Amino acid sequence: MTTLPVQQLYIHGQRVDATSGKTFKTVNPATGEVIAEVQVASQADVERAVQSASEGQKVWAAMTAMERSRILRRAVEILRERNDELAHLETLDTGKALAETTTVDIVTGADVVEYYAGLATAIEGIQLPLRESSFFYTRREPLGVVAGIGAWNYPIQIAMWKSAPALAAGNAMVFKPSEVTPLTAIRLAEIYTEAGVPAGVFNVVQGPGREIGQWLTEHPVIEKISFTGGVATGKKVMASAASSSLKEVTMELGGKSPLVICDDADLDRAADIAVMANFFSSGQVCTNGTRVFVPRSMLAAFEAAVVERVKRIRIGDPMAAETNFGPLTSFPHMENVLRYIESGKAEGARLLTGGGRATEGALANGAYVLPTVFSDCRDDMTIVKEEIFGPVMSILAYDDEDEVVRRANDTTFGLAAGVVSKDISRAHRIIHRLEAGICWINTWGESPAEMPVGGYKESGVGRENGISTLGHYTRIKSVQVELGDYASVF
């Protein structure tokens, strides 16, 4: 039995039926029960969404920046008024603890919308004199219609991260949420409409990425793709975007991020950071610090401190106020994480805690995996090399700074990195040598609206959040003006 009615598409300011005649089911990962059936967009539906966006964008771009700013600020007010309602739906769909979704997902996403609402009026060009009778100026103009393709771990937050700068700059967006967690994107679209965003400026099309995502990346009207997901899919999106019409792309992809504990670090602080960097959101965070490098001299003490903290994690019904660790977001993903755990055991890593499903009582019905910590890990182990995207920490011993920097950088990923040390000069020195786009010293994981997010190497292209992102949703037009006579050479 489903909990919610059939979920439609959202095109031109209203919910509309898809024309494909197909649906898919979205499942509550805490119980295995179907939440809703979701309609799948056809190619004709995607075309309708793009054309609607093209029409709406012209209306939106013709407004003054101050008008757009006021409308986005009103959307922020509505988001905050409905925080608990949206958080409840997000928990139902993702399995994340309600204690997390009520304080992080909508709250921080709304912060990003508010941030870009404030910047909408600050988009400006330059003017420079060339000589007494001539000068040039530049204009930053919106790209037009852009597409956002979201991930399943932070559905509504990612939708806001992608749409806020796009809309602030005067663009329209066609957004495709993950088919694993599709429910809150339409609620966001309705809030934008209620706030006064013109019809068509934020449309939502549902369905599998291999179809909907491909149609969006190849569409000649779409000028930019913002994608969050895996590396392999990201490469396909980038190739498709380039082959169709040389679209600009922004990609936040995978990670296998190092957390370096220095020998002068406070043990309790280091253990607290390591546990947060691995088990927040049940380990389903792109920036997780899953490779924890610890000085050999403090390895035993660090292991004990981490295990002590893991035992305090409260696994349970994500709707319960006391729960701070819910199920993984889907059953197929749970099976994948369990395979990685078994590979860690088979390749000789020493299991300190966890190592399988949580099956006590009602937990057996959900996609629960115990917080898992391995030690005696080697750089060539599968659990150390590949992104697991689950609650699995790998502890690696090291002997000196040069060694740990070399090993930390020995990866195709470069999303995040962190250092824990009482010596701030030392921490800066190590951070500056690490090949990662998002770094933390003596903390982990916070991504404020003002801070650019993105990776090095195969972890991504471009950035989300921060001032510079706004520029990537505009294009520069240069205009020269001649005030004097024009002298032809002919």
Swiss-Prot record:
GO-annotated biological processes: glycine betaine biosynthetic process from choline
CDD domains xref list: ALDH_F9_TMBADH
Catalytic function, reaction form: betaine aldehyde + NAD(+) + H2O = glycine betaine + NADH + 2 H(+)
Top EC category: oxidoreductase
Site (Seems to be a necessary countercharge to the potassium cations): E248
Residue positions, PTM Cysteine sulfenic acid (-SOH): C286
Residues bound to NAD(+): G150, A151, W152, K176, P177, S178, E179, G230, V231, A232, T233, G254, C286, E387
Binding site for K(+) 2: L246, K457, G460
Pfam families from the UniProt entry: Aldedh
Disulfide partners: none
Transmembrane segments: none
Enzyme Commission number, as recorded: 1.2.1.8
Name recorded for this polypeptide: Betaine aldehyde dehydrogenase
Organism ancestry: Bacteria, Pseudomonadati, Pseudomonadota, Gammaproteobacteria, Lysobacterales
